[in-house]
Amino acid sequence: MLGIFLGAALCGNSWAQKAEGLASTPQMGWNSWNKFACNIDERLIRETADAMVETGMKDAGYQYVNIDDCWHGERDADGNIQPDPKRFPSGIKALADYVHGKGLKLGIYSDAGATTCGGHPGSRGHEYQDARTYARWGIDYVKYDWCDAQSLNAEAAYTTMRDAIAKSGRPMLFSLCEWGINKPWEWAGQVGHSWRTTPDIYNCFDCEFSPGFSTGLGVLRILDRQAGLRKFAGPGHWNDMDMLEVGNGMSEDEDRAHLSIWAMMASPLILGNDLRSMSESTRRILTNPGVIAVSQDKLGVQALRVLADGPLEVYAKPLDGGEWALMFLNRSNQAVDVHHDWKKQILTDDLSKRSVDFKQNVYGWSDLWSKKTGDTSTKLQARLAPHSVLMLRLTGPAKT
């Protein structure tokens, strides 16, 4: 029994060492599922890697190109997983080499069950074998789903794959996609780099879609389910609010709000649109340097809601160097006026042990979308369009 315990402990330490430096800020990249589902092949992945460089996504910080479900073929006589020979005739190793040649990283998908959500071979019973295969191919990121896994213990199943990745000899970011069913935030910090907190995102701002076999949540519904979870997030271990739907049909105001919310909440930023054909407005939204800087702030603290006044909510995120990000969110489909008297506010966060009394400290602010500037010596007044945000970065004295 002692030997088993020591073995598990040593493997856990090994994983920590190999994972060192991965996801020190929320991971940024692209995933095939939201836009393409099972309609994927190696040409799409290559063209997406090209577009990631050509459109400035790589320069903005997006680095992972992740293949989701349906890349699988069958297992060979020795049980080794093979890619679909029609979709990926060159093989995954050649694809990884191509992506790496662009200065990017390649991610892949599997499932804790015997079959994936798309009905392809999962990793159940083949965890160590699959991890070795991924390492041999040059994989940098593993998204691990939870279909066909009803009889399994989630923590044990994900820990097995964590240990398999550690033993493979190649560092890989490990993304748990368990949909929040078994409260992964309570145990996954020592298992993976991020964990999904909700069912899948659906391409809408405020809706819930249940086609009968699954549930899809809009942006606001996912935000609401983050209540109480911020204490579990931090460098190397993040609450994952699912992939982005920016550029997939919501309004520009909704797209800006969507990215802002994910950045404030320190969720991974995984693009879910077609990078090859996105509009210039979508590209500008997704590469906004100020919003991305909030997402990637090295302090790694998730935002807290500090005000809820009807459809208007205010979220605050402490940043490195004594700065703050502040987001005013209009949840309504009607415009909302903001009249914010800074001097009546004391901004306090028990988690980061930070507090600002605006009577004593004047902070400058910059609007991360409009580029307007001001300071907290005067009231903030603005009109928020439906489903929009005002996102500010506060800079000033570090005295708290």
How does the language model describe each region?
Residues W30, V65, V99, F174, ...:
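Conserved, mostly hydrophobic/aromatic
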Residues T48, M52-S151:
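Aromatic-lined carbohydrate-binding/catalytic grooves of carbohydrate-active enzymes
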Residues L104-H120, A166-K183:
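Aromatic-lined carbohydrate-recognition surfaces of secreted/lumenal glycan-active proteins
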Residues H126-Q129, L173-D274:
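Glycan-recognition surfaces
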Residues A257-V306:
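Catalytic cores of secreted or luminal carbohydrate-active enzymes
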Residues W262-M265, I270-G272, A308-L351:
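Carbohydrate-binding surface patches
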Residues S377-T400:
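C-terminal beta-strand-rich structural cap/linker in extracellular carbohydrate-active enzymes
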